[in-house]
Every structure is written in structure tokens, then in C-alpha cells.
Amino acid sequence: NPSLEEDAVKFEFYAVLLIEDCPGDCCCCGRKYYDYSNATMVFLTPGEIFRMSKENTLPDKGYLLAFHPDLLFRTSLKNHIKNYTFFHYRKEEALHLSRRETEKVTCCLSNIEDELHHPIDTHSSIILSRHIELLLDYCTRYYERQFITRENKNKALLENMERLFVEYIASGRLQGGKLPTSGYMA
């Protein structure tokens, strides 16, 4: 039985993981039934500890973009990477992508890879950071879409719970001081 330390990896760099082709019944990283399921993205910051449990396995297909904070030195991204708040989200708050969004993210990652194969010069870190920044800007857009989608679903859930509670009160069952059970509200 491996210890917790053997299941944990401490990152000393930023990491962007794109996990593709999760099985249809997979509820990885907080995905809900109403979320897109084509791919999932997870973001890690330097110093963050990533834990793998026995239930979690590495994906069959995906990408990992890892970059050290030093890469951002003397770039505009260094000054505002803290604005990409999703780097501090819990794993359960991962980004779930549609097919079109996955294609756009994959294109951004491909552009980063192309730049990495270019001979290094005085422009390399700036161009790389701009490609990374574009990727992160798309992720911001997709997270905002996910928040809107979830807000609508959560609003519908709350409206349904309110309707059930009103029905419960109208039936007279609350008079005895007995609150509805979670089973009733489900």
C-alpha cells in the first residue's frame, strides 16, 4: 500500500493539463451531467501538490504544458498571470470543453510546440509567453461560458427545491416541526 507521499507530486512550475477522451460515464474533475465532456483542463501553480488516488488513472490521450515562472521574466504575462484565477481552483473545478473549444486549445498548444522547435533567439520567450497568454485567454472565455451554463442549471435546481418546499408547507407536514428529508427534496 503506497504512502501518500508516493502518490503526490509537487510541481515547481505552472502546468496546464488537457485530458481528452474521458469515458462517457467519467465524472472526473467535478464534471456534471450538463457540462461538456469532450475534454477537461486542469491548471496547477508552482509549489502546488498534485495527488493521484488509486481510483484515478492517467488519461489515454492529452497534453501537458509546463513552464517555469522564469520563462515569464520580462514579458507582459509575468505582470498579470495572477489574473488567471483558475490556476488556484480546486481540481473539482476543472474546465470542461466542447469539441470546438478543444480544437482551439489544441491549436494553441500546437503553436506553442512549433515555437519550441524554432531555434532560440531574443524573441523566443516573448513569443512563447504570448502564445501561452492567448491559450489562457481562451481558457478564461471557456470558464466564463461554463459558469453561465452552471448558473442556469443551479438556478433551475433552486427553483425546483423552492417549489417542493412550498408544497411541503402547503401539505401541513411542517406544522409538526418536521423538516423535509433530503430524499423528499431530491
Question: Where are the predicted features?
Answer:
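N-terminal regulatory/effector-sensing and dimerization cores
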Residues: 2-90, 99, 121
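A short, Lys/Arg-enriched amphipathic alpha-helix from helix-turn-helix/homeodomain DNA-binding modules
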Residues: 151-186
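Amphipathic alpha-helical segments enriched in hydrophobic/aromatic residues interleaved with Lys/Arg
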Residues: 86-134, 138-143
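Phosphate/oxyanion-binding loops and surfaces in catalytic or ligand/nucleic-acid-binding neighborhoods
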Residues: 70, 138, 142, 164
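C-terminal regulatory or interaction extensions
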Residues: 141-152
